[in-house]
């Protein structure tokens, strides 16, 4: 009986994954062995691929794109994973599979889901989706003050983590359009820098 050889081609850039509380290898082990909720504890920015036998698991944070394409080979399926569609297309063309490519055949891993693909033969991918981010709905009343307080507290917490990782001799920049969103980020950054005793001239 012919034994298919499954292949995973990971074209993602490992330097674009920035996890603050866990290493990428530990994160992949959790993806393979833990409940989807364990991915919820990843603190940072990530787009990860983990493989165990014929099972491939994919997960990403909201700010990191992660696309995949299942190429058909005689010896078995090849799952190509990348941040961008053009990287997938380039690899297929270099390997002689360019005629299989079409942008519609690529899929984006949805943020906040642990996606599992079984590399069995060469069917169309039939992934399963397990959500790892499940915020509580209707948690607040219609009073805007506690909502605003928690929103700004969460924003400042993330800004603080970022600032603490920037060398003290480097400037700190914020994209500021003058709108309420970028204005909130700018003011939160200013506030955190004051609390940390940073030189405000860096901002």
Model-derived regions, located:
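Cysteine-centered catalytic environments shared across enzyme families
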Residues: 1-203
């Amino acid at each position: 009986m012919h034994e298919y050889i499954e292949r995973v081609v990971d074209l993602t850039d490992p330097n674009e994954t920035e996890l603050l509380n866990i290493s990428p290898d530990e994160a992949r082990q959790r993806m393979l062995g833990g409940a989807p909720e364990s991915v919820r504890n990843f603190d940072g920015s990530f787009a990860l691929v983990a493989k165990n036998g014929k099972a491939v698991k994919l997960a990403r944070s909201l700010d990191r794109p992660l696309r995949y394409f299942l190429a058909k080979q005689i010896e078995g399926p090849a799952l190509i994973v990348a941040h961008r569609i053009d990287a997938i297309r380039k690899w297929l063309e270099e390997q002689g599979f360019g005629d299989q490519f079409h942008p519609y055949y690529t899929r984006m891993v949805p943020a906040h889901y642990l996606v599992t693909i079984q590399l069995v033969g060469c069917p169309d991918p039939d992934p399963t989706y397990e959500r790892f981010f499940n915020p509580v709905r209707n948690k607040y009343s219609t009073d805007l003050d506690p909502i605003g307080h928690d929103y700004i507290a969460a924003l400042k917490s993330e800004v603080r983590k970022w600032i603490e990782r920037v060398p003290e001799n480097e400037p700190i920049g914020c994209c500021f359009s003058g709108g309420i969103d970028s204005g909130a980020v700018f003011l939160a950054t200013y506030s955190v820098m004051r609390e940390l005793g940073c030189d405000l001239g860096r901002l």
